[in-house]
């Protein structure tokens, strides 16, 4: 059975693992998922990630991050553009998340970028998700 929305699966697995207070979560590998996870790492929402290229398929391991009170750093991971309803934005209309306190992740012609970097580069694209 094929997966309809692998990005939604990534976000849901991270959300569920954080609610269960897991240290790591393992996902099926894809280049887009790695780019999204790299952005989460750069922005300080997760500790890091690693890729395991073993047979029969590669996996992506995400190392989750918690506050000292064991509360997850990520409060909300929300999918914006979905397979049934794609959401695109121009460079001038990229929305702020929580007045600039959160980030949105876009798929652009320059690759997967945060909303802030997309504004700086002057490119628009598909809004994949919001994180705060």
Label for each model-derived stretch:
Residues 1-132:
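Core subunits and conserved enzymes of cellular information-processing
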